[in-house]
């Protein structure tokens, strides 16, 4: 690409662009740009439309609470295994998204709506020592109901793919640039509400016969 650009410029064809293609992905493109190549446009196909890096979605629904009848009290339940990373989070869950004063994203908190929030601090579910204080920050609640008693109740504005795309782009713009870089990005803070973390730990210990 660098040689092609030089040859075109030397021939006076400065308005002719350089187009690159052939199995390009974000890592290859970044490497080419870092080398100083002046590329006008990119042809990205195979690795974009085929979900090349992860062709299978490993998502599985896990029950988090149960109750008897419509009026019964919800009972938190969870899946427990020998691997803490595969243990589910019990309860009727929702998510708060917190913002810095700059309006950049500060972090997301998973909490149980039946217990509320005792303190605005999140704990990494995989590492008790990784905690973040989110107190005194503006927040919004993220989750919207999809169905109630077998009927779809999702609001019309959430069914539009273009609106969803635009919302995703807006939220990505609110991330710190250190969290969106391709190589060695910083992780975005997401964790369990303080008391939920310890209720989950206590329930897992009891189910595994450790307490």
Predicted regions and their residues:
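A small/polar active-site loop signature that marks catalytic segments
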Residues: 2
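Small/polar loops that bind or transfer phosphate-bearing groups
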Residues: 20
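Gly/Ser/Thr/Ala-enriched C-terminal appendages of enzymes
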Residues: 6-11, 16, 24-211
């Amino acid at each position: 690409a660098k040689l092609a650009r030089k040859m075109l410029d030397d021939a006076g064809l400065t308005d002719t662009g350089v187009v690159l293609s052939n199995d390009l992905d974000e890592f290859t493109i970044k490497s080419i740009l870092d080398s100083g190549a002046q590329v006008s446009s990119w042809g990205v196909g195979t690795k974009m439309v085929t979900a090349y890096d992860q062709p299978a979605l490993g998502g599985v629904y896990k029950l988090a609470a149960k109750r008897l009848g419509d009026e019964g009290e919800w009972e938190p339940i969870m899946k427990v295994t020998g691997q803490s990373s595969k243990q589910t989070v019990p309860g009727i869950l929702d998510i708060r998204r917190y913002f810095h004063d700059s309006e950049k994203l500060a972090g997301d908190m998973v909490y149980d709506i039946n217990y509320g929030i005792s303190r605005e601090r999140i704990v990494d579910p995989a590492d008790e020592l990784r905690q973040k204080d989110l107190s005194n920050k503006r927040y919004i609640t993220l989750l919207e109901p999809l169905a109630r008693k077998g009927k779809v109740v999702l609001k019309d504005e959430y069914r539009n793919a273009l609106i969803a795309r635009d919302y995703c782009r807006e939220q990505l713009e609110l991330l710190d640039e250190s969290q969106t870089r391709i190589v060695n990005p910083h992780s975005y803070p997401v964790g369990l509400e303080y008391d939920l973390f310890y209720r989950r730990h206590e329930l897992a210990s009891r189910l595994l016969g450790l307490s």
